[in-house]
A protein has these predicted regions:
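Interfacial juxtamembrane loops and adjacent helix segments
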Residues: 56, 60-61
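Extended, low-polarity transmembrane helix blocks
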Residues: 1-54, 66-84, 88-148
Length: 148
């Protein structure tokens, strides 16, 4: 069975990329990249290490207005989650859990806060779904500790 030279050439290139990049590198970059997005967001909600600001509480009260949640509680939960889960992702520890938690947070933001920002939220969901489905990869504490 003969194949077209372009197809054969592309198959060689694709195989080389797969060997050179590998899924483990893709998972590492996904973990670090999405962790940075959420960690930076968390830093905007606090002063010092983890003191939630009045501005953050005000945003949850006046702009975000999440249903069923007290704004002070929501601001604290978001600030702490945006520090803890990115740290877990960066370390590759409890990766699937952290990815699902941030995916849930993304869904809440999309549904209740900024429904028109779906392109941004989709760009967050993509690496989070990859990490939830495939785990943290070889360069992680999950792997070092033989966690799934």
């Amino acid at each position: 069975m003969s194949t077209h030279p372009i197809r054969r050439g592309w198959t060689v290139v694709a195989a080389g990329l797969e060997r050179w990049l590998g899924l483990d590198l893709v998972l590492l970059v996904s973990r670090i990249g999405i962790a940075a997005v959420f960690f930076q967001s968390g830093r905007t909600k606090v002063e010092g290490w983890l003191t939630v600001t009045g501005t953050a509480v005000g945003l949850f009260r006046d702009e975000y207005r999440l249903p069923l949640l007290d704004p002070t509680l929501a601001a604290h939960a978001a600030a702490y989650a945006e520090h803890l889960f990115p740290l877990l992702l960066a370390l590759g520890l409890c990766t699937r859990f952290a990815a699902l938690a941030l995916l849930g947070m993304t869904a809440v933001i999309e549904i209740f806060v900024y429904p028109d920002a779906w392109p941004t939220h989709l760009s967050w969901a993509a690496p989070l779904l990859l990490l939830a489905a495939r785990g943290s990869g070889r360069f992680s504490l999950d792997r070092a500790m033989a966690l799934p």
